[in-house]
């Protein structure tokens, strides 16, 4: 199978054979070979050769290609949504919104690029001071599996807009979505070599990240892989490295008046996308006492009724599957370990079918566990921690190496202002689901959640660098010479 797209041609990979499966039926959706280090080098050379012509194209011409890509996404929206749903397991209603986000990213990127870059000039003595921006050259984009269309698109679009050429390495769990996305770029008229697709797993990723021919790398994925990349790029200030990683995100609940509103927001924060969003709530901080007991009882009762099913099931489920049987097993094992260490199951997560990666929501009280692991459990497993007072809640919220998202459900604006000020996170929400963020806002965290904000409004800052110039059309001897210099 021709699994790679290099220099405008579809080629068979020469590396390890791998496949993607529908996580519910286990039906094979895609199979092919990954790219070898030699094929990665060929793709880097193709991107390097394509770079000058693409960078010299007028901005409006590049924008035209991007807008045609957006139109192609809209024309093929049903096909793309179904592809995302069957490969990730997320319900169709959610896949449809992902395709919409992909198309909307074009206008957002164009607006931010115009505002953050462009050309500025002013007089400076007998010359003109000019500030312009230039693309970096060849950049790599590593995509995740949870939003295999939208998230890599958030880096590919601004990179191409700025005049860079791109090497796209998608998750090995979602190769079919990546292939379809590249087909849409081809249909939009993107020139050969400007975007190259490198399918593959760990070996392909290592070869691409280590290739000296790339000028930068944009990564979205696990903290473990991101940390490896950071170590690999250590001592390389000539390379751009932007990392968007995970989080052990806290959602603090105050004693609010509308309990059902709190319950609904918690469910949207913890269990949407089967808990496979990097901003999902992992830790639910609930006050001690009768009010907290009542909230948890209501949360458990409602969560137990959440519909879980296949991506195309009708009526549509709220939750689809996790990405794979291996992911499901890891989550079940994590729950078992928590319970063995003294946690209490308020609602035990289950796997109804052994050969389907469908999991029901789990709510585990870990308040009494003395040695809690500070890790991102990427699935529908919510840990409850009871707190004595608001100061203790904030301290517990910050008790993590991560710092991606944090949220507060409270009727008190003063408490939110305190929470916002003292929280260590890149996204802080008040009375809204933790997974909600404006698509125009820069996305990212602090600590082990990553570095930089190479997306949305700030994307242009990482795709083009400023060049300062002093310019004058004529070379003349100044009226006054510097002391100690004579021309006669």
UniProtKB/Swiss-Prot annotation:
GO molecular function terms listed in the Swiss-Prot or TrEMBL record: succinylglutamate-semialdehyde dehydrogenase activity
Gene Ontology BP term (one): arginine catabolic process to succinate
Signal sequence extent: none
Protein EC: 1.2.1.71
Family: Belongs to the aldehyde dehydrogenase family. AstD subfamily.
NCBIfam families: arg_catab_astD (TIGR03240), PRK09457.1 (NF006992)
Name used for this protein in its record: N-succinylglutamate 5-semialdehyde dehydrogenase
Taxonomic path: Bacteria, Pseudomonadati, Pseudomonadota, Gammaproteobacteria, Pseudomonadales
